[in-house]
Swiss-Prot record:
Signal peptide range: none
Protein family per UniProt: Belongs to the nepoviruses RNA2 polyprotein family.
Pfam families on file: NeA_P2 (PF12312), Nepo_coat (PF03391), Nepo_coat_C (PF03688), Nepo_coat_N (PF03689)
Protein name: RNA2 polyprotein
Organism: Arabis mosaic virus (isolate Syrah)
Additional remark text: Virions are comprised of 60 copies of the coat protein.
Biased composition annotated in UniProt, kind: Pro residues: 221-234
Region entry Disordered, spans: 213-236
GO MF annotations, alphabetized: structural molecule activity
Post-translational modification: Specific enzymatic cleavages in vivo by the P1 encoded 3C-like protease yield mature proteins.
């Protein structure tokens, strides 16, 4: 047979020749060979056709000498016909023959003449051409009817046509089992109307050897014409696979819509084979009234309307064992109640047969409700109303909350038109179908509650707990919930809480498919409830039963799963907040604590002893206060004026002083990086007009500057939050890893000193009766940190600004009550350094914008009116260039907006240059050379008689949308670090630590550079990266006559015990040299102050310093230079 030689080129030739109906060029097929799976499939097919002559012609030659490697192109003539003539065409653009190979074969036939002589004649085979490509099949849809029912019917038809093939597959799957051999074949009407695309589908879903099929459908099913062959393509990309997944999701939504519209269609889905045991009384699932549940890890593919013949062989093999276990399990349950054995079986184990067939536990509509009239059917839509996939399962104290309405708006409107004003939920079913490995001990709990009830004890409907490794689990409850037709519009009728205590799977993996179904009916003033006797009996029995260990609930759980024992449920149902009126125009924010739903784990027994002692009932709900780490108080004087310093709270002292459970967790974890929630509790009062500021000072930079008078230049330069007295209790979130930049050690500080400063931004208009204080509560969960450094606040790059601004608050604008047509301006010199008296204050927002010369775009922000509720004003904000206008008619022609109740605004920056500068020259004024936001009081301010205090307004800028940035101030260039001059000694040595800092010297004059990079160092706590240093110097004497040099040495540790690294010596005549400096230590990052941590450092030694006129050091950040911990710095 010979050896075959494979290559991508030859496999592409083979695939192209054997798939001519797909089309595609040779180059496209060659690209397909890059997929290893496709290449292996083609190679396997070649192996199965080794005997073919054309295959041997293609693969028997060594690589490089075959017909596929012909320099003129693929020699199709030799591959297909065996001739030596090269296939006609341009080399490199060959195509295979468009007709079969045998059409060109010549058959030599032997014949004997009349004279007895043997002759030969040549004859070409006459092979007919294939039939022409038929046109695609299509069927138009009729116009929608003008009524709602006509629209629904048209929608049903459209969705039915889209899912035609799936429904036909289900019908084909049932035919061989529904009709045993020898019986006449009765084909359903839906099956006869099906249209199929390929003959393979018929042979796949139906046994073509059955003669009855030919009698019913001679020639097979009706087939539409074949569509045109698609062009060959490369393997699907990620985007194509994503689109296919979204299409499948849309099909699932279409199925849900059809179900909600009441369609009764076949659907191929997943169901479970029940285990060899059944429900017992000592189990794990709880419910408020009645529960029935079954589970099994094995699954198989069946139809939702499974025929009796499909489940017959399953029930026969398990019937004997099932009867024994039913007697053992139910006898103990019935013995503890007033029910008989048969009543208990009908109430709880009747669902086992439905699980076996893949059907829901809910009874059919015709069995649940009786018709209300002779010609009226049951007014219900039942079964599955919610299906979702669970991924990113919450663990610990996190709980996934799902809100949904069992009844759609269309259904409600339909029955409202019939005079029905209420809906009754008679039964609720929860089904959990897990994915993953059998025997997975991950527990999962689903709790169902009534969403409009604030008391969780009263809202509780039921819960279901299972192990994911035990397969499908189902539970059914009979709440009898009745509500108005208007309530479902609130989108929160039923609340589901999903949680796990020990989930360890990936966050992006799908754990389970959870389905929730309801059995419901619509009733009105003239309609009575029509619950059938079976459903009514189940409801009555569910309310009369009592569990053996849970109290006022029945525990029915699966038995015989792969995971032994029972899940321990721990679902945290989080609290909320609400507003409560406590006085005239005064409201209080009431925080509701979270609640814990707990089920203690216990072992199962196959049989329940009727003489066993009843255990102590465990509560299902308990009110807890979670995560309280510390507390403190802040005194407030009765006459609290603007700029008043109140108090500073140390975060570490608050936690350690409280000595709660979180402090113990902190000691155990050691290093933590928590997310703090600070709750400031104070009574609301809308008459004072006080606004406080809570400033988070992670590195203790502003404490000394606000001890007497708190200037907004400091309190608003660090992360801060506004506390309005009129709003009452306020909550603030502090991401410690982001705002501080690194983790906290439990026993001592490292770089940080986190403090909360409380100061007064706008003073009180009315003096209070006495001094008072408010309470500060600190909530956090202390878990061990995985690293020391947190999230960097800023990473240096040439295009770092994306338009978002945080904590950019303008000091209060005060409107005089006696002024009319007043205005206040906010300058857009956002890159200018703040000045407080003789000091400069560097903060992050100003430094970030100073990297650019100018900016344009849309300024978005919010206006906070901080005056008492007795004041009033109407504000219009516009953007203007070069001052303000005195022509009010012109003002209203400018683009602007009025400040509404929420205070938000969005104004495009107006400038003759389309941008406004971010800094100014010293001689320029802000009113003449920049754009401003002008807030015009077009009406007001007004206040009652006797009021004299000004009306304060605070503006916060949150974003500059669509920023039109100019060129950077220093694009990818060096920054000036320091200049040394006027040397007094010859031998000079400068020690540069592993940080960017302010260098000082007693033997020379030092001049520090002023640039955005040094400002960024100043307004952060830590920095880390690599600096490229460039040293340049000038000489005092003539060039060439000076002697001496500059020695640069890299060291690690200290001089006494450290290690020496690379070193270089540069002669003074070189006039400069370059090196690099690593910024950081063994912890990762360094502050800009001296610190005795083991790290690298640099020594610059001058042996003839007096010969130098000046030494200049430039620096440039390399790569991703990172800054951690947002703060400010005063110079």
């Amino acid at each position: 047979m010979g050896k075959f030689y494979y290559s991508n080129r030859r496999l592409a030739c083979y695939a192209q020749a054997t798939n001519r109906h797909l089309g595609g060029s040779f180059e496209q097929w060659l690209q397909c060979m890059e997929d290893s799976a496709f290449r292996a499939e083609v190679k396997a097919r070649v192996q199965s056709e080794r005997e073919e002559v054309r295959v041997r012609r293609l693969f028997s030659y060594p690589v490089g000498s075959g017909p596929a490697e012909d320099p003129r192109g693929v020699n199709w003539a030799y591959i297909c016909l065996g001739t030596t003539a090269h296939w006609a065409g341009v080399p490199g653009d060959m195509v295979p023959p468009p007709e079969p190979v045998k059409a060109q074969e010549v058959v030599v036939q032997r014949s004997v003449g009349e004279d007895g002589r043997t002759g030969y004649r040549r004859q070409c085979l006459n092979i007919p051409n294939p039939p022409p490509m038929p046109k695609p099949y299509s069927r138009p849809i009729g116009a929608f009817a003008p009524t709602r029912s006509g629209f629904i019917r048209a929608t049903v038809k459209r969705l039915t046509r889209e899912r035609e093939e799936s429904r036909a597959a289900a019908l084909f799957a049932e035919l061989p089992l529904e009709y045993p051999q020898g019986a006449p074949l009765v084909v359903p009407r839906g099956f006869a109307a099906m249209r199929w695309t390929y003959h393979a589908t018929w042979s796949r879903w139906y046994d073509t050897s059955d003669e009855r099929a030919l009698r019913t459908h001679p020639g097979g099913p009706a087939l539409p014409p074949l569509p045109p062959p698609p062009p060959i393509q490369k393997p699907p990309s990620f985007e194509e696979r994503l689109q296919a997944a979204l299409h499948r999701q849309s099909c699932a939504r279409a199925f849900a819509l059809e179900t909600s519209l009441g369609l009764n269609m076949a659907w191929v889905g997943m169901a479970t084979i029940p285990s060899t045991s059944v429900c017992c009384a000592d189990g794990r699932t709880t419910g408020g009234q009645t529960i029935a549940q079954e589970a099994d890890p094995l699954t198989h593919r069946v139809s939702s309307n499974t025929a009796p013949g499909r489940a017959q062989w399953i029930s026969e093999r398990r019937s004997a064992l099932r009867r024994r276990e039913q007697a053992n399990s139910l006898q103990g349950l019935a013995a503890q109640t007033d029910m008989t054995f048969e009543q208990a079986r009908n109430a709880y184990l009747g669902a086992a047969d439905m699980i076996e067939q893949g059907l829901p536990l809910l009874p059919p509509l015709r069995n649940a409700y009786a018709p209300r009239g002779l010609w009226r059917g049951p007014s219900t839509r039942a079964n599955y109303t919610l299906d979702f996939r669970l991924n990113g399962i919450p663990t610990g104290e996190n709980t996934l909350e799902i809100l949904y309405n069992p009844v759609s708006d269309e259904e409600m409107e339909d029955y409202r038109d019939r005079g029905m004003s209420a809906v009754v939920i008679d039964a609720l079913e929860i089904a959990i179908n897990p994915f993953g490995m059998p025997g997975n001990p991950t527990d999962l709990t689903v709790v169902a509650t009534y969403g409009h009830e604030r008391n969780m004890e009263r809202a509780f409907i039921g819960s279901s707990s299972t192990f994911l490794g035990n397969g499908l689990a189902r539970a059914i409850f009979f709440p009898g919930l009745q509500y108005s037709q208007e309530e479902p519009r609130r989108e929160s009728l039923i609340r589901l809480y999903v949680a796990s205590t020990n989930a360890t799977v990936d966050a992006d993996s799908v754990l389970a498919a959870i389905s929730v179904g309801t059995l419901r009916q619509h009733i009105g003033s003239l309609h009575s409830r029509t619950v059938a006797s079976s459903v009514h009996a189940a409801q009555v029995q569910g309310t009369t039963l009592r569990a053996t260990m849970m109290g006022n609930s029945v525990v029915v759980s699966p038995e015989g799963g792969l995971v032994s024992g029972v899940p321990e449920a721990n679902v945290q149902i989080g609290g909320g907040s609400s507003m409560r009126m406590v006085g005239p125009l005064a409201w209080e924010n009431v925080e509701e604590p979270g609640q814990t739903f707990s089920i203690r784990s216990r072992s199962r027994s196959v049989r329940v002893d009727r003489n066993a002692d009843v255990g102590i009932a465990h509560p299902r709900m308990s009110t807890t206060t979670r995560g309280l780490a510390g507390r403190g108080t802040v005194p407030v004087p009765k006459d609290c004026q603007a700029g008043k310093y109140l108090k500073t709270l140390d975060l570490r002292d608050m936690v350690s002083g409280f000595s709660g459970i979180q402090y113990e967790k902190w000691i155990t974890a050691g290093l933590v990086m928590p997310d703090f929630k600070v709750v400031i509790r104070y009574p609301a009062n809308a008459f004072t007009g006080i606004t406080w500021v809570m400033s988070f000072d992670a590195y203790n930079r502003i404490t000394s500057s606000i001890s007497t008078t708190a200037s907004p230049a400091y309190t608003l330069s660090v992360p801060h939050w506004l506390l309005h007295h009129k709003n009452g209790t306020t909550s603030c979130d502090i991401d410690y890893g982001e705002l501080c930049g690194h983790a906290m050690w439990f026993s001592a500080t490292t770089f940080e000193s986190p403090k909360l400063h409380f100061t007064c931004l706008t003073g009180n208009n009315k003096e209070l009766a006495a001094d008072w204080e408010f309470v500060v509560e600190l909530y956090a969960e202390f878990e061990a940190a995985k690293s020391f450094l947190g999230k960097p606040n800023f990473i240096y790059s040439a295009d770092a600004f994306n338009g978002s601004l945080k904590f950019l608050t303008i000091p209060p604008l005060e409107y005089d009550l006696s002024a009319t047509s007043a205005y206040k301006s906010v300058s857009l010199l956002l890159g200018q350094t703040l000045v407080d008296g003789t000091h400069k204050v560097y903060n992050f927002n100003n430094t970030l914008l100073s990297y650019y010369l100018g900016i344009g775009g849309i300024v978005k922000g919010k206006v906070h009116v901080c005056s008492p509720c007795t004041y009033g004003i109407v504000l219009r904000v516009v953007s203007e260039w070069n001052g303000v206008t005195n022509n009010w008619n012109q003002l209203f022609k400018y683009p602007g907006c009025y400040i509404e109740e929420d205070g938000s605004f969005a104004i495009e920056i107006r400038s003759p240059y389309h941008r406004t500068p971010l800094r100014l020259i010293d001689a320029q004024s802000a009113s003449s050379f920049t754009s401003t936001l002008n807030f015009y009081a077009i009406s007001g301010p007004i206040a009652p008689s006797g009021e004299t205090a000004k009306m304060p307004v605070v503006v916060q800028i949150e974003e500059i949308a669509l920023p039109d940035l100019s060129v950077p101030s220093f694009p990818n260039d060096y920054f000036l670090w320091v200049d040394f001059s006027s040397f007094t000694v010859d031998v000079e040595e400068y020690v540069i630590g592993s940080r960017f800092f302010d260098i000082s010297s007693t033997t020379s004059t030092v001049a520090l550079g002023d640039n955005p990079f040094s400002h960024m160092i100043a307004c952060h706590g830590l920095h880390h990266g690599i600096l490229d240093l460039k040293l340049m110097w000038d000489l005092e004497g003539e060039f060439g006559k000076s002697s001496g040099g500059v020695t640069i040495t890299k060291l690690c540790g200290d001089k006494a015990t450290g290690m020496d690294g690379a070193s270089r010596v540069c002669a003074l005549q070189n006039m400069g040299c370059e090196t690099e400096l690593y910024i950081g230590n063994y912890a990762g990052a360094n502050p800009n102050t001296a610190l005795s941590l083991y790290s690298r450092w640099l020594a610059i030694k001058l042996d003839k310093a007096k010969s130098m006129k000046m030494l200049r050091i430039l620096c440039k950040p390399r790569g991703n230079f990172e800054f951690y911990g947002r703060t400010c710095f005063k110079v």
